[in-house]
């Protein structure tokens, strides 16, 4: 069970990083 929770946390953190990088690159292109 704890492994499943850790996997979900990893996915959320990974997608959060990917989204942050994508938005950052988009903002740089707009500027």
From Swiss-Prot:
Membrane-topology descriptor: Single-pass membrane protein
Entry's localization field: Plastid, Chloroplast thylakoid membrane
Presence of the UniProt keyword Oxidoreductase in the record: no
InterPro entries the UniProt entry points to: Cyt_b6/f_cplx_su6
Key words of the record: Chloroplast, Electron transport, Membrane, Photosynthesis, Plastid, Thylakoid, Transmembrane, Transmembrane helix, Transport
Molecular function GO terms recorded: electron transporter, transferring electrons within cytochrome b6/f complex of photosystem II activity
Gene Ontology biological process terms in this record: photosynthesis
Recorded GO CC terms: chloroplast thylakoid membrane; cytochrome b6f complex
Function noted in UniProt: Component of the cytochrome b6-f complex, which mediates electron transfer between photosystem II (PSII) and photosystem I (PSI), cyclic electron flow around PSI, and state transitions. PetL is important for photoautotrophic growth as well as for electron transfer efficiency and stability of the cytochrome b6-f complex.
Homology family: Belongs to the PetL family.
Self-association state and partner proteins as the record states: The 4 large subunits of the cytochrome b6-f complex are cytochrome b6, subunit IV (17 kDa polypeptide, PetD), cytochrome f and the Rieske protein, while the 4 small subunits are PetG, PetL, PetM and PetN. The complex functions as a dimer.
Protein name: Cytochrome b6-f complex subunit 6
Highest classification ranks of the organism: Eukaryota, Rhodophyta, Bangiophyceae, Bangiales, Bangiaceae
Chain's gene name: petL
